[in-house]
């Protein structure tokens, strides 16, 4: 088995703003009501995101420019490099879409990172998702079952760390060896009795991994 892997959610964990909020704020004001319906459990996560992502109505070059404005935790590129240089593999696990994630990785010249997410593509001025119901990690609610991904990685690595911030992350956190939780995820894991380390940024995560001897200074 390989020694260790670090798996991170993207929106709200690596990035400081969810991509869907950027779309709603700039191009789809009706999405604010849809957001309420989603949070009330009236629509599934994947249906909410599909509707938002198909409401941009912009040329692809402009969409990519907008994606590049998404703020991220500035330390993340350095953190990923440190994980990789210390024998770890870094993965991104997102219930959004890999379309904007790959553009962010390219912007920051982040390499050798596997992205597990819903497949996204540009078509007729919007972002669409290609959901395969026969895929091993398919979820009817999220498009991707994050728990299945963590469980599969646990078969390959001695240690699997996870970082997340919101409800979809509460499920894979159960299976990770240790979860670093931001924002709303902290209370959710508290309620479920799932152990976690409370963090706000990746410098704190790195400090923990240094103290555990996984990353050298």
What does each model-identified segment do?
Residues 75-89, 96-217:
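C-terminal cap/substrate-recognition subdomain and adjoining C-terminal extension
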């Amino acid at each position: 088995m390989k020694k260790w892997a670090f798996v991170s959610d993207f929106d709200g964990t690596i990035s400081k703003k969810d991509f869907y909020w950027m779309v709603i704020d700039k191009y789809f004001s009706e999405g604010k009501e849809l957001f309420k319906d989603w949070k009330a459990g009236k629509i599934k996560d994947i249906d909410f995101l599909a509707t938002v992502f198909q409401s941009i109505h912009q040329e692809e070059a402009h969409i990519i420019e907008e994606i590049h404005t998404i703020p991220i935790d500035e330390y993340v590129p350095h953190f990923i490099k440190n994980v990789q240089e210390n024998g770890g593999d870094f993965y991104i696990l997102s219930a959004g879409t890999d379309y904007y994630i790959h553009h962010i990785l390219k912007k920051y010249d982040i390499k050798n990172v596997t992205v597990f997410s819903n497949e996204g593509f540009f078509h007729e001025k919007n972002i669409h998702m290609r959901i395969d119901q026969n895929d091993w990690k398919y979820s009817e609610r999220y498009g991707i079952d994050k728990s299945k991904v963590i469980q599969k990685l646990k078969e390959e690595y001695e240690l699997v760390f996870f970082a997340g911030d919101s409800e979809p992350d509460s499920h894979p956190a159960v299976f990770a060896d240790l979860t670093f939780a931001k924002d709303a995820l902290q209370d959710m894991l508290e309620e479920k009795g799932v152990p976690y380390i409370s963090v706000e940024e990746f410098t704190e995560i790195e400090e923990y991994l240094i103290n555990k001897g996984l990353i050298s200074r």
